C-alpha cells in the first residue's frame, strides 16, 4: 500500500495504461498478461490486482476473478482508480451491495472526502436505499454546502414517501412529503433556490400532497417565472383542471390554439373545458348551453376560415364537438351541421393522407351500424373510383384505400357471400398491381409502396374466407401475395408482421424466423414487439433453435438493466428531477416485463430438455442455472404487459373489436402459462436437488423433501384452479387477433398427472417405499400414454395431408413437442437417479451389512430400487425408439391444391408466380425437415442418455 501511495502519479497512470487499453478493445487475455506483468514488479499495486480481476471476469474465469476481487476488497482501498475498477466489476456481476460496502469503508477512512461521499450516495441510489441516500446527502451538504446535495436529500425524502417501504401507509407518506416541502420552503426563504429543476421538484412535491392552489401560486409567481420560464403548458392545464378553474383554462387554450392551430391535444382540452363551463351555468339561465358551446363552435369555425393552409386539428375538433354534444343529447346538428357532411368534407380535404382512416374511425362508434354503412358508401362514391375504373393519381389511390378501410371498419364486408369476397380479393390484387406499376416506381429502399395497403386488406379478406371454410388454401394464397409485396417494398413492416403471423398460424417456424429477422427488431422493441415471435416459439418443435432467439432477447434485458441503473444515477448527478420517476418507472417495467420473465423460464426449460452430455456435464449445466426450487423469484403482482398490440395495423369492424378486453384476456392467460411453466421448472429442479442437492445448498436435513412436497401440492392446486377458472381460447375471428396461448394445450396434455406421479416416484425411490413397484408401473403407464399420443398425433397429421395439411398443423406440432418435452425431462431425471443409486450402492458394498431387527415393513433395498430404475430406463428407451420411427415417417405438409391452381388465382406475371409460390412452398418443406431433424437428434441424445 505504501508503495502504491508513494508511486509517482504520472508513472502510475502510464504503467496501467496498456491494461486499460486492452480491456477497452476487448483484448482481455492481453490485459490479463499486462496486469500480471505489472504485479510481478509491484505486487502491492491494488489497482493492477483489481484490473486482473476484471480481466479474469471478462474471460469467464469467475472463481479466480472472485478470489482476486475479494482480496483487493479486503484491503479496503481508498484510491479512486481501484474503487472505480472494483465498482465496475461488481456492476457487471450485479453485486451492487458490495459497491456500497466499498465506499462505506473508504468514507470511514476519509470522512470529509466529497468525491467518495458522492460515490457512496450513487451506490445507495443503485440499490434504492432512500433512507441511506438522505443521510449521505446531508453529510455531503455539511461538507460542501452545494444546492445539488441539498436537493439530493430532498428527493430522497420524497422517494421514501412515494416509493419506500412505508409508502403504502398514508400517514407516513404525508409525513415524508411534508418534511420535503418544509426543506424546500426553508431554502426558498433563504433565497437559495437556483435552477428550474429545483422549481420543478417543489411543484411536484406540492402536487403529490394535492396542494394545487399553492402549486398554482408558485407556478405563476415571480420566482418560478425567473427560474422556470420554460415550464410545460400541460402543467398549467393540470393545475387549472384540479382547481376547477375552467374559465381561465378555456381562455388559455384559445390563446394557445390561435398560436398553434394543429394541436389536437389542445383541442380536446378546449372542448372539455367548454362542456365543464356548460355544467357551471345556472339551470335558470336560458341558452346557457348556447353561450358556452356556441362560442366553442364559433372559435373553431374562425380558425378554419382564417387558416391559409388547411390543417386537420380544427376539423377534427369540430367532429369531436359534434360527437360530444350528441352524447349529451344536445342539438349538435342544429349548432354545427350534419355529421355525415362534415366527415365527407374532412375526407375531401385529407383523404389523400394515410392517417385519414384512423381520424374518421375515432368518430364511428358514436353512430349506429346503419349510419356507418351508409357513410362508408358515401365515402366510396366520393373517392371517384368505381368497380370499372382505376385511380388516376396517388391522391385518388389513397382516398380509395381510405374509403375501403373505413368500409371494412363499418362491417360492410362481413356479410358478403364467399364468391363476392373472392371477387373483392381479385379486385384488391389488381388495384395493388396497378398502383405498384403506375405510382410505385423509383421508390427509395426505405419507402413503402403507395398501393401496399391493398394487399394488406386482401390478406385480411382471405383470412375471413379461410376461417369461414376452415381451409388453408385462401390464406396460403394471401401469404404468397404478401411475399410478392415484400419483394417490391422491402421496408414494409406491416407486410412482415402479417406474414410472420400467418407462418406461425401454419406452424412454419423457418418462415416465421425469417420474417422476424427481416423485421430487425432491436433494443426496446425486443420487449414491446418480441411477443409476435417469442411467445409463439415454445412447444413449436424446435427446442435448440428457440434457444438462440431467447438468448438474443435476454441479452438485451441483462445489458439494459445495468444501463438503466446508470441512467438513474445520471439524473441525480445532473439534478434532472423531472426525469427521475420516468426512468425509475421504465426500469421497473422492464425488470418486471412478462416477456423477460417468460423468456427466462422457457430458456431454462429448453436447456434441460436439450441436455445431451454425460451425467457430470448435465449436472454442471443444471447447477449453472441457479434454480432455487424453494424460492419463487417472480413478482407476480408486478408483472408488466409492455406489448405494443397496436403495431399490427387493423381495419376490422369496430363493433366486433374490443382491444382492451383482448389485451386483458391474453395477458391473464400468458401469466397463467408462466405460472405453469415456472412451477414445472421448480418442481423438476426439486427432483434433481433431492438427489444431487447435497453440498450445493446449505439447508437442513429434510428441507428438500419438504420443498418437493410443497411444490407438488402447489402443482396439483394450480391445475385445479385453472380448470375452475374455465378460460376460453382467445377469439380468432380476424387475422390480426392474437394466436391462442398455450394454456389450453398445457391443460389438455397430461402434464399434471405426469409430473405429479414423477414426484411420488422420486419420494418413493428415496425412502424405499413398499409401494415403489406400483408407482413405477403408474409412471410407466404415463410414458406409454404420452408416447401413444405423440404417435397418434403424427398419424393424424399424415392422414390430414390428403385434405388440408396446414390448417391444423400448428396444434399438431405443439402436441408432439409437448410429449417429447415431458419424456425428455423424464429421461434426464432417470439418468440422475440412476447415477445416484449406482454411486450409493458402490459405497454401501464396502461396508459390512448390519442386522436390522426392527419390526414393521422394511425399505426396499438399493439393489431392488436400482433394478426397477433400470427397467424404467429400458422401457423409456423403447418408447423413444417408437417416437423416432413415427417422426421419421412424419410427412411434410401438402398444400391443399396444386401450384398451377394457385398460379391461376394469383393473377400475377407467370414467371413471378412460379418462383414466388415455389419459394413459399419450399419454406414450409424446409421448416418441416429441420424440425424433424432436430426432434430426431433430440431423441438420439435421450436414447443414449437412458441406454445405461
Swiss-Prot record:
GO cellular component terms, A-Z: cytoplasm; growth cone lamellipodium; lysosome; NatB complex; neuron projection
Record has Repeat as a keyword: yes
KW Disulfide bond (keyword) present: no
Location relative to the cell: Lysosome
UniProt keyword annotations, A-Z: Antimicrobial, Immunity, Innate immunity, Lysosome, Repeat, TPR repeat
Tissue distribution of the protein: Expressed in the fat body after immune challenge.
Domain of life: Eukaryota
Function comment: Non-catalytic subunit of the NatB complex which catalyzes acetylation of the N-terminal methionine residues of proteins beginning with Met-Asp or Met-Glu. Has 2 roles in the larval immune response: required both for the phagocytic degradation of internalized bacteria and for the induction of Defensin in the fat body. Within the phagocytic blood cells, has a role in detection of infection and activation of the humoral immune response.
Name used for this protein in its record: Phagocyte signaling-impaired protein
Organism: Drosophila melanogaster (Fruit fly)
Amino acid at each position: 500500500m505504501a508503495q502504491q501511495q508513494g508511486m509517482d502519479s504520472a508513472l502510475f497512470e502510464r504503467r496501467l495504461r496498456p491494461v486499460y487499453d486492452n480491456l477497452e478493445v476487448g483484448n482481455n487475455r492481453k490485459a490479463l498478461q499486462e496486469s500480471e506483468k505489472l504485479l510481478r514488479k509491484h505486487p502491492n499495486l491494488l489497482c493492477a490486482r483489481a484490473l486482473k480481476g476484471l480481466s479474469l471476469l471478462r474471460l469467464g474465469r469467475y472463481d479466480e476473478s472472485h478470489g482476486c476481487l475479494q482480496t483487493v476488497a479486503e484491503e479496503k482501498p481508498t484510491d479512486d482508480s481501484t474503487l472505480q475498477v472494483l465498482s465496475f466489476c461488481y456492476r457487471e456481476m450485479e453485486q451492487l451491495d458490495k459497491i456500497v460496502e466499498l465506499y462505506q469503508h473508504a468514507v470511514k477512512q476519509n470522512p470529509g472526502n466529497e468525491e467518495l461521499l458522492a460515490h457512496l450516495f450513487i451506490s445507495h441510489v443503485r440499490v434504492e436505499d432512500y433512507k441511506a441516500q438522505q443521510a449521505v446527502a446531508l453529510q455531503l451538504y455539511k461538507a460542501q454546502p452545494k444546492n445539488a446535495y441539498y436537493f439530493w436529500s430532498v428527493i430522497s425524502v420524497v422517494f421514501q414517501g412515494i416509493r419506500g417501504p412505508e409508502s403504502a401507509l398514508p400517514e407516513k407518506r404525508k409525513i415524508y412529503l411534508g418534511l420535503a416541502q418544509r426543506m424546500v420552503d426553508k431554502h426558498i426563504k433563504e433565497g437559495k433556490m437556483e435552477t428550474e429543476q429545483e422549481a420543478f421538484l417543489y411543484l411536484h412535491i406540492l402536487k403529490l400532497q394535492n396542494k394545487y392552489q399553492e402549486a398554482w401560486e408558485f407556478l405563476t409567481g415571480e420566482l418560478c417565472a425567473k427560474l422556470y420560464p420554460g415550464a410545460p403548458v400541460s402543467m398549467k392545464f393540470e393545475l387549472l383542471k384540479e382547481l376547477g378553474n375552467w374559465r381561465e383554462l378555456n381562455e388559455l387554450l384559445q390563446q394557445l390554439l390561435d398560436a398553434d392551430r394543429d394541436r389536437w391535444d389542445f383541442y380536446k382540452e378546449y372542448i372539455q373545458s367548454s362542456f365543464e363551463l356548460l355544467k357551471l351555468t345556472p339551470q335558470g339561465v336560458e341558452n346557457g348551453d348556447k353561450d358556452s358551446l356556441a362560442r366553442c363552435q364559433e372559435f373553431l369555425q374562425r380558425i378554419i376560415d382564417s387558416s391559409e393552409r388547411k390543417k386537420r386539428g380544427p376539423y377534427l375538433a369540430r367532429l369531436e364537438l359534434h360527437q360530444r354534444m350528441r352524447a349529451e343529447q344536445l342539438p349538435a346538428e342544429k349548432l354545427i351541421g350534419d355529421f355525415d357532411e362534415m366527415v365527407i368534407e374532412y375526407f375531401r380535404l385529407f383523404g389523400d393522407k394515410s392517417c385519414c382512416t384512423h381520424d374518421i374511425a375515432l368518430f364511428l362508434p358514436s353512430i349506429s351500424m346503419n349510419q356507418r354503412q351508409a357513410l362508408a358508401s358515401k365515402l366510396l362514391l366520393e373517392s371517384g373510383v368505381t368497380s370499372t375504373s382505376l385511380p388516376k393519381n396517388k391522391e385518388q389511390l389513397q382516398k380509395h384505400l381510405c374509403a375501403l378501410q373505413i368500409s371494412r371498419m363499418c362491417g360492410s364486408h362481413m356479410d358478403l357471400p364467399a364468391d363476392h369476397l373472392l371477387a373483392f380479393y381479385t379486385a384488391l390484387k389488381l388495384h395493388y398491381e396497378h398502383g405498384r406499376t403506375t405510382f410505385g416506381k423509383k421508390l427509395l429502399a426505405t419507402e413503402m409502396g403507395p398501393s401496399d395497403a391493398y394487399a394488406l386488406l386482401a390478406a385480411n379478406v382471405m383470412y375471413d374466407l379461410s376461417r369461414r371454410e376452415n381451409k388453408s388454401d385462401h390464406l396460403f394464397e394471401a401469404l404468397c401475395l404478401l411475399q410478392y409485396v415484400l419483394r417490391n417494398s422491402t421496408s414494409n413492416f406491416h407486410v412482415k408482421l402479417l406474414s410472420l403471423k400467418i407462418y406461425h398460424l401454419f406452424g412454419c417456424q423457418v418462415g416465421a424466423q425469417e420474417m422476424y429477422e427481416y423485421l430487425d427488431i432491436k433494443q426496446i422493441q425486443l420487449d414491446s414487439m418480441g411477443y409476435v415471435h417469442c411467445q409463439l416459439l415454445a412447444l413449436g418443435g424446435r427446442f435448440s433453435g428457440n434457444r438462440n432467439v431467447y438468448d438474443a432477447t435476454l441479452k438485451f434485458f441483462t445489458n439494459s438493466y445495468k444501463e438503466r441503473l446508470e441512467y438513474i444515477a445520471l439524473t441525480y448527478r445532473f439534478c434532472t428531477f423531472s426525469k427521475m420517476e420516468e426512468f425509475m418507472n421504465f426500469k421497473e417495467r422492464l425488470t418486471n416485463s412478462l416477456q423477460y420473465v417468460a423468456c427466462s423460464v422457457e430458456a431454462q426449460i429448453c436447456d434441460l430438455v436439450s441436455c445431451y452430455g454425460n451425467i457430470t456435464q448435465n449436472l454442471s449445466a443444471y447447477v449453472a442455472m441457479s434454480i432455487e426450487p424453494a424460492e419463487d423469484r417472480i413478482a407476480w403482482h408486478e408483472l408488466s404487459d409492455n406489448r405494443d398490440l397496436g403495431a399490427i395495423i387493423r381495419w376490422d369492424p369496430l363493433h366486433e373489436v374490443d382491444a382492451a378486453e383482448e389485451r386483458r384476456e391474453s395477458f391473464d392467460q400468458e401469466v397463467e402459462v408462466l405460472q405453469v411453466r415456472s412451477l414445472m421448472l421448480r418442481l423438476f429442479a426439486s427432483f434433481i436437488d433431492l438427489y444431487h442437492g447435497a453440498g450445493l445448498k446449505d439447508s437442513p436435513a429434510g428441507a428438500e423433501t419438504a420443498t418437493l412436497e410443497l411444490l407438488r401440492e402447489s402443482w396439483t392446486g394450480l391445475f385445479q384452479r385453472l380448470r375452475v377458472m374455465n378460460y376460453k381460447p382467445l377469439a380468432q375471428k380476424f387475422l390480426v387477433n392474437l394466436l391462442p396461448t398455450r394454456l389450453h394445450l398445457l391443460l389438455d396434455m397430461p402434464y399434471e398427472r405426469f409430473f405429479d406421479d414423477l414426484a411420488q416416484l422420486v419420494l418413493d425411490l428415496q425412502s424405499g417405499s413398499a409401494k415403489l413397484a406400483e408407482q413405477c408401473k403408474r409412471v410407466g403407464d404415463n410414458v406409454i400414454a404420452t408416447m401413444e399420443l405423440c404417435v397418434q398425433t403424427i398419424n393424424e397429421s399424415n392422414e390430414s395431408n390428403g385434405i388440408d395439411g396446414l390448417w391444423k398443423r400448428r396444434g399438431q406440432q405443439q402436441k408432439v413437442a409437448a410429449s417429447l418435452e415431458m419424456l425428455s425431462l423424464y429421461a434426464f431425471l432417470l439418468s440422475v437417479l440412476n447415477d445416484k443409486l449406482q454411486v450409493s450402492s458402490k459405497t454401501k458394498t464396502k461396508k459390512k451389512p448390519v442386522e436390522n431387527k426392527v419390526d414393521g415393513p422394511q425399505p426396499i433395498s438399493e439393489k431392488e430400487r436400482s433394478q426397477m430404475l433400470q427397467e424404467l430406463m429400458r422401457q423409456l428407451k423403447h418408447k423413444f425408439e417408437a417416437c423416432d420411427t413415427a417422426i421419421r415417417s412424419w410427412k411434410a405438409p401438402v398444400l391443399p391444391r396444386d401450384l398451377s391452381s394457385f398460379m391461376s388465382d394469383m393473377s400475377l406475371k407467370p414467371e413471378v408466380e412460379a418462383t414466388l409460390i415455389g419459394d413459399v412452398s419450399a419454406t414450409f418443406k424446409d421448416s418441416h425437415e429441420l424440425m424433424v431433424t432436430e426432434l430426431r437428434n433430440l431423441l438420439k441424445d435421450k436414447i443414449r442418455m437412458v441406454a445405461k
